[in-house]
UniProtKB/Swiss-Prot annotation:
The keyword Iron-sulfur does not apply. Its main location: cytoplasm. Dimerization mediated by the LisH domain may be required to activate dynein. This is Nuclear distribution protein PAC1. Signal peptide: none annotated. Residues 83-93, 428-441 have a biased composition (Polar residues). GO terms for biological process: cell division; establishment of mitotic spindle orientation; microtubule sliding. Transmembrane segments: none annotated. Residues 83-108, 424-449 are annotated as: Disordered. It is found in: Cytoplasm, Cytoskeleton; Cytoplasm, Cytoskeleton, Spindle pole. The lineage of its organism: Eukaryota, Fungi, Dikarya, Ascomycota, Pezizomycotina.
Length: 471
């Protein structure tokens, strides 16, 4: 027996070899191998069926990994050469404070494979995986560093409307929702196997977000998932059981978006009734309503604590709320072409005007100073909260058609195991769903939620492309 394999691994290999020989009609060779192994491998028809594709799958996986290693080595060599020949100007850009980094054209990667409009994107909280969903009913998993398609996930029967990574500590899941009325959970650690389907909504499911585990008083443990639907409800699910644990009513029409606070205590929602709501995630009670939009509210988001100093000044407060407080400020985007920033009581602080079409998605910069928006006017805009929300950068023609979604890559996890990344909330200071320590963080790059800012965003569009903007 090979000294490299355990007894169990050797047995698995032998079963795979025999099953492969049988699958290609080499029964004599299979029988000879059995004889050589002294009949130590017991393989009935059902077991043979299970193992027959395993050898080929592992072989192609090795080839794929070898290619990825070669690509990474090539890229590493190119980056080293670039670093060796760098000018002071290029070095100053490379050493730019991540808290002030903003995306600029051209995109690092334009990812093409979908056959319908891209509706949603989400970053894995640790690995360089990016999920995108489309009206073509598929989810695609990309390596955003290499710009390569890793796999296509099929399972939904109608348009995929949203995706999100998160879940229990140490067990990251991918959630997706669809016009087929279902939510599906996929396991990234098991080749994105569909582990659960959550039926219950009576119409299209527009948005899904994992509710982070965080401060005391928050919903328990990171097992919870929030969904918003055209059936006018928000539902909260326990992903470990698949049960709906709460149905929240109050909206009068289609609920387009739902977004959890970093500590999981609150949910922000918005939709066709034009009145966004701040909800208590535990009780479902409406804490505040936000009245002022003149058309459908397409997107909502909650400001991270890093934004409090800028938004408090904008609101005329003498000092910002404590960083430990939750959902002190929120932002909403609408088909009325405006973005509105509010305090948690429902008081309008600022209306941002500049887009020429529907606002489709929002994300706060993890550093806290900026708010980014994308729109059906094909642009990505960056608003400086410290300058009265002045638009300080416009990426014109960010896509060739309506821009439907934007996400910020999760922060690099620090020693404490916290990540200001996704796990459900667009890289805006979420406690980690995975207690894995990856790197330390300099004070300059710390966002306050823990973790080093990753200067990477992804956008999706009706042009069927996903684009990655990076420093």
């Amino acid at each position: 027996m090979s000294q490299l394999l355990t007894a169990r691994q050797a047995e698995e290999l032998h079963k795979s070899m025999i099953a492969y020989l049988l699958s290609v009609n080499l029964s004599k060779s299979a029988a000879a191998l059995r004889e050589e192994l002294a009949d130590s491998v017991h393989l009935d028809d059902a077991t043979a069926k299970k193992y027959e594709g395993l050898l080929e799958k592992k072989w192609t996986s090795v080839v794929r990994l070898q290619k990825k290693i070669m690509d990474l080595e090539s890229r590493n060599a190119a980056l080293q050469q670039e670093l060796d020949s760098a000018t002071p100007t290029s070095l100053s850009r490379r050493n730019q404070d991540p808290a002030s980094w903003l995306p600029r054209a051209p995109a690092r990667h334009s990812l093409q494979s979908h056959r319908g409009p891209v509706t949603c994107v989400a970053f894995h909280p640790i690995f360089s995986s990016l999920a995108s969903g489309s009206e073509d009913t598929t989810i695609k998993i990309w390596d955003w560093e290499l710009g390569e398609l890793e796999r296509t996930i099929k399972g939904h029967t109608r348009a995929v409307l949203d995706v999100d990574y998160g879940g229990p500590r140490g067990g990251t899941l991918l959630a997706s929702c669809s016009s087929d009325l279902t939510i599906k959970l996929w396991d990234p650690s098991d080749e994105y196997k569909n582990i659960r389907t959550l039926p219950g909504h009576d119409h299209s499911v527009s948005a899904v977000r994992f509710i982070p585990s965080g401060a005391a008083g928050s919903p328990m443990s990171g097992n919870l998932l929030a969904s918003a639907s055209r059936d006018k409800t928000i539902r909260i699910w326990d992903v470990t059981t698949g049960y709906c644990v709460k149905t929240i009513q109050g909206h009068l029409d289609w609920v387009r978006d739902v977004f959890p606070s970093p500590d999981g205590r609150f949910l922000m929602s918005g939709g066709d009734d034009r009145v966004p709501r701040l909800l208590d995630a535990s009780s479902g009670e409406t804490k505040s309503t936000f009245i002022g939009h003149e058309h459908v509210v397409e997107c909502v988001t909650i400001a991270p604590a890093a934004s409090y100093p800028h938004l408090a000044a904008l609101a005329g407060l003498k000092k910002p709320p404590p960083a430990s407080s939750s959902a002190e400020f929120v932002a909403t985007g609408s088909r009325d072409k405006t973005i509105k920033i509010w305090d948690s009581r429902g008081t309008l602080i600022k209306t941002l005007v500049g887009h020429d079409n529907w606002i489709r998605a929002l994300v706060f910069h993890p550093g806290g100073k900026y708010l980014l928006s994308v729109s059906d006017d094909k642009t990505l805009r960056c608003w400086d909260l410290s300058q009265e929300c002045k638009c300080v950068r416009t990426v014109s023609d960010a896509h060739g058609h309506f821009v439907s979604c934007i996400r910020w890559a999760p922060n690099i996890i620090n020693e404490s195991g916290l990540v200001s990344g996704e796990g459900g909330i667009n890289g805006q200071g979420t406690p980690s769903m995975n207690g894995v320590s990856i790197s330390t963080t300099s004070k300059k790059e710390d966002t306050g939620g823990g973790g080093k800012i990753r200067c990477v965003i992804a956008t999706g569009s009706v042009d069927m492309n996903v684009r990655v903007f990076a420093s």
